[in-house]
């Protein structure tokens, strides 16, 4: 995961740690395709026929390559009145707290990806529940989706990307140590819904 300003983005290129926030935002927003993935020839950006925006077009085979937003999927795991958070073992935001989440992989649904990330980062056994938040991080081309999840037991076994995994009551949440805006907003919405006694699905734009 990385952060651009106060926004949240997952798994930036390795060189990102050396970039300014503005440079990093440009790098992630436009992942320039230099060569055609189909044939290896040079790709150039222009507006193809019957389109309305620039695409990477192969100069040899004519293949048009699309660059689309990335899905980040995670959970809000709950045990009783407590919520599970993981403390990051990797840069950036090393040592800060986050909900278990990461890139969706090919061949899985958003819920399957969120479950996988929860197991990988926290070693938690959960039952997946409804989709809770959909947060569009427009500036960096990502969509973050968090599901509510009921923990089946209190066993935790953090993976290599987590220093530790811990359960927090609402008044114990380390708000000033949360890694990403999407995590903070999701937690705020979760506790608001819990106080009302009903959970919805929330959508918002960030950046």
Stretches with model-predicted labels:
Residues 2-92, 103-120, 124-155, 196-207:
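N-terminal leader/linker segments that precede catalytic domains of diphosphate-processing enzymes
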Residues 89-91, 96, 130, 148, ...:
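Short, functionally important structural connectors and interaction interfaces within domains
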Residues 97-102:
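Conserved acetyl-CoA binding element of GNAT-fold acetyltransferases
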Residues 158-189:
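NUDIX/MutT-family hydrolases
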Residues 188-196:
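A short, amphipathic alpha-helical segment
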């Amino acid at each position: 995961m990385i952060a651009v300003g106060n926004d949240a983005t997952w798994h930036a290129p390795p060189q990102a740690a050396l970039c300014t926030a503005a440079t990093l935002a440009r790098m992630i927003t436009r992942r320039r395709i230099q060569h055609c993935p189909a044939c290896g020839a040079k790709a150039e950006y222009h507006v193809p026929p019957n389109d309305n925006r620039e695409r990477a077009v192969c100069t040899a085979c004519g293949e048009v390559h699309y660059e689309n937003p990335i899905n980040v999927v995670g959970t809000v795991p709950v045990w009783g009145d407590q919520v599970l958070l993981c403390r990051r073992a990797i840069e950036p935001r090393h040592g800060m707290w986050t909900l278990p989440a990461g890139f969706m992989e090919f061949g899985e649904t958003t819920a399957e990806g969120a479950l996988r990330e929860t197991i990988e980062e926290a070693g938690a056994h959960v039952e997946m529940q409804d989709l809770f938040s959909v947060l569009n991080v427009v500036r960096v081309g990502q969509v973050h989706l968090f599901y509510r999840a009921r923990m089946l037991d209190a066993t935790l076994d953090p993976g290599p990307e987590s220093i530790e995994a811990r359960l927090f009551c609402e008044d114990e949440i380390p708000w000033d140590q949360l890694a990403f805006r999407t995590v903070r907003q999701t937690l705020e919405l979760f506790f608001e819904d819990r106080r009302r006694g009903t959970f919805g699905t929330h959508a918002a734009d960030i950046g």
